[in-house]
Each structure stands twice: as C-alpha cells, then as structure tokens.
Amino acid sequence: MKVVILCGGKGTRLGFETKIIPKPMAKIDKEPIILHIINYYKKFGYNDFILALGYKGSIIKNYFKKNKNFLINVRCVNTGKNTLTGGRLLKLKKYLSKEKDFMLTYGDGLTNQNLNKLEKFHTKNNKVATMTIVRPPVRFGEVKMRGNLVNNFKEKPQIRDSWINGGFFVFNKNIFKFLSKENEMLEKEPLEKLSKKKQILGFKHLGFWQCMDTPRDKEYLIKLLKTKKAPWKTR
C-alpha cells in the first residue's frame, strides 16, 4: 500500500527556521521529521511513499536524491507552492490510479499507533475514509495541588473529553470523487461531505501523538528523543 505524505505547507508557526527550509525538513535531533515519519511507516512494512511537495520542495527532493540507502521507494511530486491539502491530493490522482486503498498523513506529526491495525480497521469497514482521531494534548503542563504542595505534575496531558483529527488516514480510490479543485482543504468540504454520507470512520488512538506546529512542540519532541522516551523511535 502506498503512503502519501503532505509536505507542501509553509509552516510559518514554527518560526524563522521555515524561512530557510520546509517544515518537514526541520530536524528532531539529527534527522528531519519527515524521515522519522517514514521510518515509523517502515516499521509496519510500508515502503512506497509519495511526497506531495510545495513550499521549498526542492530541498526535500534533493535530500532523498542524495540519500538512496533508506531501502524505500520515494516519489517526489511538485503539487504547487500555494495549493491547499485537497488540491495536493487531487494532483496525485494519476500516481494512485492502480491503488484500491492508500494511506495519507501530514509531514509534521508523530505517533506510536499500530498502523497495521489501522489498515485492517479500514479494510474491514469498507468506507471511503478512515481518520485517526486523538485526544489533543494541552499546551501547558497540568498541576494537581494539595494545599500548597504540588501533588502531581504531568507535561502535556491529553484533554479527556474531545477528539481531533490526528492525520494518519486510509482512503480508498473513491476519495477522488469528493475532490474537485486545488483551492480546497481536504479537511473542510471533502471530509464534511464524507461525514454527511457516513463514509468516514474515526480510528481512536489513545497513545502517543504529537504534531510539530511550534518551536515549543519541536523542543518537546527533541527532549523525548534525547531522554530515550520517544514512543515513535524504531531503532
């Protein structure tokens, strides 16, 4: 099964770094986050990747051109600098024409979910789309007090009563019937239509999930890696 990774956004919230490189090339310790994502998919047997490039996409393309020892197949496709996520996927249609199903995720998120179970869940239920849903981590640590004593502290706890889109999708080929133009976000009209037609399922993941939106997020991921507490690490 092919894996699409959306790599075209500008990632402005990450700060000055993304004025020089695209967000998926921002390093978590010694490796860009895009490689952490790919290595995690490899752990579950997925080796065929399509990278939807946009902003500073040539940097990503050159990285994989120079590093051919990853034992994977990587196709880099320029989907436009300002194209939105739905349009990026639409521009990949010809590269996915022979696929009954394919996976898709964002180039800035990490998890420790079982991707094989995600695929089996999608296949069993036979819907157009399966979306991983996660509990959103709060931005600040949670403190529990007993009098003036800090009784418990948890860095980035999960919010317990809501779910959000965590990426790590599985789509079947009928998703392209819901995409019509390049200036639309996958997460808006297409997924809203799928929801109304009862053609999208949520795969609940209660384990680790973290996107890298801000410098604070990046530092948190680096901290996990350096303290050998990175749940996504495969080696």
Predicted segment positions?
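N-terminal nucleotide-binding beta1-loop-alpha1 segment
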Residues: 1-19
